[in-house]
């Protein structure tokens, strides 16, 4: 179109629109990410440097060493993150960390710097920290005590730290192998030359799993040869005559000339320099979970030379590409930052495990094997089967395929599908048989390039193995014979176990049917209806059952808040679990007395503050109203309030543990306007999208259209107030009225879906708090 043929005003308007569109598309999406979101309020995320699904993450470690500067200390309470925004005492940068988890692990191999005379006690060389900055792939901080600027960036398997000594003079680089978040101890390190060290540290005992241990190997290269260097080791405390033999007993002993390897629980390596003012010393670190040699290979391959700026640019570019899969328009600045930070958190775990040569530690045995596809680790499946994997299947289906292939490899290597796998070890944390749900959900979405015969074999093992030999379903015999799991011990989580088995068996029924296994499908479908055993007419809730078949008495439905011990339920109470029958919501409603009683009882969960936004069992509750069209306005109101109240552009902006992306995935789906309240069903509950327009770039290997556009269009232009309701949406030329659920094919093949938004829902006008 030629602008000369347009009226002047129209031409100028078009120019402005074109300019705005260009400006928005050219803006870096990494600048919309705030890595400090979730670093307080027990969100347990961290602001360190990492690339999408990278093995390496490097983050500030500030949870030990100073009662004065730290509000929280990892050794004084339950603590599961190497960093919190509430603390201000910096001990160093830890290499390989977990994001959003509830148990401590990894967060070790801590590199730092100091100025002045050498002191290897981290409570002494640690420093107050200030001027923190972070965005995807980069973090920096000022070490106030030493006048050092510390910066970090990362590749998939390596990191590089830059320490700039502003004053110059006596300067030190310190590698602490004793301090860390892990509950395991013991490390070994040796010099390869004056500027390169290699070694390993023992990790594990995650979430009460004492046998789930593994080694993290490392290779560290310093940019400048040190005039003086050596080891340190904390000596045991001695008494009496014995103490006279060692002047360093009970203290850190310095080894300035010894160059063979050294081992111990509290050891480290130091490098001392005389620096010029403003001089920068770089520390390049490679890691592996196979060997020291592979850690060094990863380092020399991914950082063949020293170029901090190039590594940073590559990290930023990788994030920009990953984030640009979803492009949003409109919304507030805070809403955009919340959304893209959630997408950033989604892409941290699971992370790759294989080294550059394809080697990785096999499941259970930790023997070395080689993979042809990306091998993933950190499968927090009780959390992530609900929304993380469905979202990955939509946005990053090739990643999701490799994750399923990894799960099947784990079955071949260890004999079982994973439940909560961590660096090649099964921790058996939480309950259920979640791999079944992930695999079926992936297949139902059309991602089918994996061995379905092997998958079905693996699924059946957990669903049919009797007795104590069943590692995934330890109470299988009761479940199979009774249709439920009785409460045999005071706090044995029996109801939680059974509810997870029901949704797993429903998914297995769906997969069996797709594989042509009709009898199996019928068996598992019958099992999935066993939730009805727990329904108590007296309270209208699910209630634990004793071995004699009677309900637990006395019964306190609200017991279990704030993780207090609770008979029958894990990390929650009866209210948090009683609507968790995602595969049969209409059946549950009938059991509860019909639509009206179901809706009233579900609404009371929110009215009486029995909804827990910080944990998974009731995370889909807001979307259950969409099964009843006249009540769907409640979903729109509640999700709007929850997003506004619990998801904020600040460190406390996640309602609790991010659970390796599960809370972030809830926010992403909710802001997009649809949610998979029953994984495996290919059905979504709808809510009002947050943004004016969202463009999702789909992978055409798996999806018909290259994009899915979601837009909102107000029906009442006269007001600027937030419109949180809709009762119509349009796909193509078809207008849907009073429809609040949509299936996956309809949505993914829509090309464009338009929500017509308004101020008023199914009740008199309600404003958001």
Regions inferred by a protein language model and the residue ranges of each:
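Beta-strand signatures of extracellular beta-sandwich domains
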Residues: 728-730
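Flexible, glycine/threonine-enriched loop-and-boundary segments that flank and lead into catalytic domains
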Residues: 677, 702-709
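Bacterial Sec-dependent N-terminal signal peptides
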Residues: 1-25
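Accessory carbohydrate-recognition regions in carbohydrate-active enzymes
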Residues: 24-389, 393-437, 443-499, 507-533, ...
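ATP-dependent phospho-/nucleotidyl transfer catalytic cores
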Residues: 504
